[in-house]
């Protein structure tokens, strides 16, 4: 359903204009020209048309996506695989696929391009590029990446907590360690990785259609 954007290799200005709507890309581009070039080289631009499937429920993969243009719909699937009601709409600038990527679990919802959208354009990153010990990225870039993940998951879980108070969820969040060591260090990176995965565990286990930010939870 999705395809690689053939113009990615020839229209660099268009690529950079689209990515400028994503704070993570802006931060890396501002701080390190070499890392900016590496990130651009390792980012795949994906296109899909109206109704095309972007993520299928039940799939397991290690990719993270940013919607750059268009609109996506998050849907559950019935037992026969047919799409069910729309749970959430994904708008440009939003990230999706986070929780399954962190936990290595199956996607729990299907994401399609909205029928009313002319097209959807997305940026795809491989999580393992940032997570593995021999990452091609610098410590600063990896810190920015995991800070982004922790922020996104905390936001989603906080919205969930406020909309549907859950003492078990509150207790789980209190157990997530807060880093107090040296900033911009390997220790901080390790702590962020731990925080991201520990936040993802209660978030992934408490999905309820209609009241949780489905870009991170049902779609993840």
Each model region followed by its residue ranges:
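Cytosolic regulatory regions built on CNB/CRP/Popeye-like sensor folds
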Residues: 1-220
